[in-house]
Amino acid sequence: MSDLAYKRTNVYEKADESTMKAIFDYAEGYRKFIDGAKTEREACAFVEKAAKKQGYKPFAFGKKLKPGDKVYYNNRGKNIYLIRVGSGNIGEEGIRIVAAHIDSPRVDLKQVPLYESDGVALAKTHYYGGIRKCQWAAIRLALQGAVVR
């Protein structure tokens, strides 16, 4: 019966040196991404730059694509699509879609946010994603984003 029991293992105790190096190298790449992509627009720019390094070209509507083509489409700097054209028969083999969602926690101010209450200046915010207002008192904030006129 002990063979079926769940045993906790720690990767730091079990992994060899090359595996640990691969783990930390991957984590360092992720750290660079989250450091350089704090908003959706920054994430799109980051991904576009990385895609260009991998040989992706801008997508052009009406241009015929051929197997092996790698193109990207940046939709107004808010989302990006990467496309690698395969060589198989779509009707028989189908297509593979890999999707990722950019979710940037933030305080999103309304168009005219400032108001005063009880002698204190406050800001009206949009509420997305379930972030509690009390969480923001515990972390450093940066002012980033786009100004809308």
Annotate each predicted stretch with a short phrase.
Residues 1-149:
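N-terminal hydrophobic/helix-forming segments and targeting peptides
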